[in-house]
Amino acid sequence: MIITTTDVIQGAVIESYLGIVTAEVVYGSNFLRDFLAGIRDIIGGRTASYERLFEQGQRKALEELEQRAQRLGANAVIGIEIDTGTINLDQSGVLLLITATGTAVKMR
């Protein structure tokens, strides 16, 4: 399976467009991680725990996207976009949201 951000794959011919595929990954926040990230933000520096979480989430979203495309009979997903964001849950924290979207295609 080819997964790419481009809309064209050199040397390949798209036989059919099978539709838009989307995958979402949601993580709950962690009080200790949030606290330590806040301290790093105050003194400067990167928050490695959140960076790892977003990297892991992007990988999982792309894996899920590939599975959904395969169920449609695709052998490639083109035009991939990955979006990240947060969902506020009032006093109880936030959810981290990672979304991957692309177009499932059948190529030859």
Curated annotation (Swiss-Prot):
InterPro entries referenced in this protein's UniProt entry, alphabetically: UPF0145_dom_sf, UPF0145_YbjQ-like
Superkingdom of origin: Bacteria
Gene3D superfamilies attached to this UniProt entry: Hypothetical protein apc22750. Chain B
Family matches, as Pfam families: YbjQ_1
Signal peptide feature range: none
Cited PANTHER family: UPF0145 PROTEIN YBJQ (PTHR34068:SF1)
Entry similarity comment: Belongs to the UPF0145 family.
Protein name: UPF0145 protein Npun_F4817
Protein's organism: Nostoc punctiforme (strain ATCC 29133 / PCC 73102)
Source lineage: Bacteria, Bacillati, Cyanobacteriota, Cyanophyceae, Nostocales
